[in-house]
Amino acid sequence: MLVPMYTRVLAGTGDYGIVTNLYGWTALLLVLLTYGMETGFFRFINKKEEQEPMRVYASVLYCLLGSSALFSVAVFALLPSISASLGYGDHPEYIGMMAGIVAVDAFCCIPFAYLRYKGKAWRFAGIKLLSIFLNIILNIFFLITCPWLHAHYPEAISWFYRPDYGVGYVFVANVFTTLITLLLLIPDILPGIRAKVDGTVLKQILRYSFPILILGIAGIFNQTADKILFPFLFDDKEYANEQLGIYGACFKIA
């Protein structure tokens, strides 16, 4: 839905190439950071005769919280070198924002799974749809409304808007959407935070989930490898992003 807008309002095809590349990385990292635990959660929480459901929820929730936090700390500690190696040395904040987004999204997959387990279909669908619409609205605001306001009433938005930031606002919109989604899930997260972690159950879930992680990596890498590896095929980073932008837009539309 956002592709036509991106291809129309972003400064050049290279900007959409950046979006395509970073969201390719995000999809792969999301599989790595959930490491099959969503499936493991459903497998064990439904064994009520053997496991206490809330202990299963707490164990998986704390495990994802810990791994997501460690990932975030590692990325931010190595942010300059990671950004430079991926070709974003001039904008390390892109990598920082995407790392935060994927860490929170990985953690939130378990509260969403808990909603499905509890049969709260309306709440599950409502938060998901709100996140989608909010992301669309924020993209329209930053990429269409703000440039218009800057052209006609610059003093109204000069305190927060940078007209030269361009594609960065795609990631800013996603950050806001992710944080609001997390806040909406707090009532569903708290029961798991208050419950006790069962180390024995957690080990069983991890053993069960590991093969799912391997299959997940294989599946998602098959879908995203082209977007991830594309920039490394060219010596000229700017040209690579331009070509990836064209390829990524055609891929989405097709």
Map each language-model feature to its residues.
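Helix-terminus/linker motif at the lipid-water interface of multi-pass membrane proteins
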Residues: 1-15, 83-84, 220-254
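Small-residue-rich midsections of specific transmembrane alpha-helices
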Residues: 2, 20-45, 100-110, 216-225, ...
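Short membrane-interface helical motifs at transmembrane helix boundaries
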Residues: 3-7, 70-89, 146-158
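Transmembrane-helix boundary and interhelical linker motifs in polytopic inner-membrane proteins
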Residues: 7, 11-15, 29-63, 83, ...
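Membrane-interface helix-loop junctions in multi-pass transport and translocation proteins
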Residues: 8-15, 118-126, 130-182, 240
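Alpha-helical transmembrane segments of multi-pass membrane proteins
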Residues: 28-29, 65, 69, 73, ...
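Membrane-interface junctions at transmembrane-helix termini in multi-pass inner-membrane proteins
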Residues: 44, 104-128, 189, 193
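Interhelical loop/hinge segments that connect adjacent transmembrane helices in multipass membrane
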Residues: 150-169, 182-223
